């Protein structure tokens, strides 16, 4: 019997998946939007929302484990934590952007909410 694992495997090993999601989360924090596949966008949304919540609560050590970029770390705590101070959750939004020409994969744009 197959049980739900709670996350998408995305065709990658655990360490590769974690590294990819951490890198995508860093890119979203720096650029405030990223274009990727729908499945990856849904997974990285969990990571980014958790990072913003941790930054709002001032838990910087847990954020440092995920964000290796100092500029993204600084922006998260100085800009984004204050921007979303009164917002209880849902810091990202996913827009579907059609199909990718090469492999016909569904593409989405994930953005930080203003």
UniProtKB/Swiss-Prot annotation:
It holds the Pfam family Ribosomal_L17. It comes from the Bacteria. One of its GO terms (biological process) is translation. GO terms for molecular function: structural constituent of ribosome. One of its GO terms (cellular component) is large ribosomal subunit. Transmembrane segments: none annotated. Keywords: Ribonucleoprotein, Ribosomal protein. PANTHER family: LARGE RIBOSOMAL SUBUNIT PROTEIN BL17M (PTHR14413:SF16), RIBOSOMAL PROTEIN L17 (PTHR14413). Belongs to the bacterial ribosomal protein bL17 family. Part of the 50S ribosomal subunit. Contacts protein L32. This is Large ribosomal subunit protein bL17.
